[in-house]
Amino acid sequence: MGLAVLLGTSGALWLTEALIMPKASYAYTSRLNLFLTLEEDEPYSSLVRRANMAARAGAQRSFDQDLLITEVVINVTGENSDGIAVPVLSLRVSRQEWSQQPVTEYWATYFRGAAALLE
């Protein structure tokens, strides 16, 4: 009888602990790859402007949709009419950084050589 009481008590303690302490949640990084086409006679600066807007929307949407996301990495690739595709910008930002300053231009890395390759 002593063993049954001991096992019953430990089972009750385990059940109580499981109810009080929920399972641990894990934070993670959201990764997004976006592709934009450089339109006929469109200046490269316009493509960069569109890339900034797309990256900003992607980052905001990622943080809004999932509270466990702690960091967002977005790569924007541009493609010209000849089928040449090159990275235009890469945005890597934490939730805390984004909440303090949600500005793509502040956190993004721009690839300067992309303009020459796409035009």
Report each predicted region and the residues it spans.
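Bacterial N-terminal signal peptides that target proteins for export
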Residues: 1-14
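Sec/Tat signal peptide C-region and signal peptidase I cleavage site
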Residues: 14-27
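Polar/charged, Gly/Pro-rich intrinsically disordered segments
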Residues: 27-30, 37-43, 49-52, 65-119
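N-terminal post-signal-peptidase region of extra-cytosolic proteins
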Residues: 53-62
